[in-house]
């Protein structure tokens, strides 16, 4: 059985294709009935079989009232196009003459993506350097993925330059010309071959003015202007020395731009401004929020210091030292430390142990005034002793130490242990 003749460069539909093979459940068949999934092989086809990064076409194969819905097309080693799908009505017989029609709108969207891929390749070489080589690609309707060799991260400025290069080439409306040439002649013309790809003696060359000239068997537009719109969605590393760009084209880009505009308008309405003034409005609100946060922190600090003063007046006398133990949940380590520093700096005889439960974790702080340290009571020793009670650990200096734990139910036990610990230190 000869290989399938591809006629899809010039035709979206043909009415004289012959069914040369039917495959059902992996076995060749004489017929394929309604509701059956399988593979149809034709002597010629307008359907593009997936290769070179471009996905296969979809569409229908018809014979009278019988319809086979094509969902994928692959090319086997023998060059036959395997049209996978399902008989949705009627039946098909081996040897029948059928009409084969691709989804032309979907093919057009794929063409946009493929032509844009060539422009992107040229843009990367122009912006990053000639060391850039294609390392893989995937072309789908109105979107593409392009892998390429490059040794470092791409800066936002470089990415913008690549995007601008592609869109400028689209706006120029460059004719897309295809030629079938002997491979040596194609190389002499300057056509770029995909790195590592094997080619026959004759190759198809796709040329876009002075921007791009590459070996390519895929389907393309006849003018770059028909790409319409191009937008890079993401860029990143996929392997050592290999990076990936994902981009959208055509209607997909238009849809995203519309969605983005709608979101801007909704955001502007929420903030009672216009989309043009949105940036300055948000900037002003962020400044206001920063000022409010600053004032709130000051109020919290003042309230905390007021609480610290009350701690000092109600401190417990233990052999000449003043002991404060307290739990204040919701305070972070920094706020707890400020409270402890105030106690230590105001009262040389202070031994303060503070605890806070925040997001399911325990933070412990111990502070000792200079007289307390001189008498042998050290903050680091206190934390080392009580943190394990809360399922944690900690330590620090004689006058200030911190620790933590995960057993929030043990905080009371940890604080209660401080009295006996100090008494043991003082003897």
Enumerate the language-model features and the residues they cover.
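A glycine- and charged-residue-rich anion-binding loop/surface
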Residues: 1-427
């Amino acid at each position: 059985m000869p290989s399938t003749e591809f006629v899809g460069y010039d035709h979206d539909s043909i009415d004289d294709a012959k069914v040369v093979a039917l495959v059902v459940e992996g076995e060749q068949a004489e017929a394929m009935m309604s509701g059956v999934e399988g593979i149809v092989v034709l002597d010629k086809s307008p359907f593009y079989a997936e290769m070179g990064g471009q996905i296969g076409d979809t569409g229908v194969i018809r014979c009278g009232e019988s319809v086979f819905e094509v969902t994928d097309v692959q090319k086997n080693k023998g060059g036959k196009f395997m049209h996978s799908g399902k008989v949705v009505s009627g039946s098909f017989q081996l040897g029948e003459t059928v009409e084969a029609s691709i989804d032309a709108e979907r093919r057009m969207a794929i063409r946009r993506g493929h032509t844009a891929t060539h422009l992107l390749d040229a843009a990367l070489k122009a912006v990053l350097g000639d060391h850039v080589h294609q390392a893989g690609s995937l072309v789908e309707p109105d979107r593409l993925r392009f892998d390429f060799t490059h040794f470092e991260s791409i800066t936002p400025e470089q990415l913008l330059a690549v995007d601008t290069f592609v869109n400028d080439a689209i706006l120029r409306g460059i004719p897309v010309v295809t030629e079938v040439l002997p491979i040596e002649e194609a190389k002499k013309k300057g056509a770029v071959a995909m790195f590592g790809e094997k080619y026959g003696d004759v190759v198809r060359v796709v040329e876009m003015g002075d921007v791009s000239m590459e070996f390519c068997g895929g389907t393309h537009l006849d003018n770059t202007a028909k790409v319409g719109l191009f937008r890079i969605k993401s860029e990143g590393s996929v392997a050592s020395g290999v990076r990936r760009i994902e981009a959208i084209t055509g209607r997909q880009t238009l849809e995203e731009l519309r969605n983005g505009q709608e979101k801007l308008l909704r955001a502007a309405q929420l903030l009672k401004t216009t989309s043009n003034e949105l940036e300055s409005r948000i900037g002003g609100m962020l400044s206001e929020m920063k000022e409010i946060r600053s004032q709130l922190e000051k109020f919290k600090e003042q309230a905390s210091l007021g609480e610290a003063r009350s701690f000092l007046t109600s401190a417990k006398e233990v052999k000449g030292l003043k002991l404060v133990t307290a739990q204040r949940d919701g305070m972070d380590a920094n706020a707890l430390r400020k409270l402890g520093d105030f106690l230590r700096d105001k009262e040389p005889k202070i031994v303060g142990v503070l605890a806070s439960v925040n997001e399911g974790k325990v933070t412990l702080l111990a502070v000792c005034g200079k007289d307390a340290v001189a008498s042998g009571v050290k903050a680091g020793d206190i934390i080392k002793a009580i943190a394990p009670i809360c399922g944690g650990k900690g330590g620090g200096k004689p006058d200030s130490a911190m620790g933590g734990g995960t057993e929030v139910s043990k905080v009371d036990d940890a604080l209660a242990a401080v009295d006996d610990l100090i008494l043991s230190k003082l003897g």
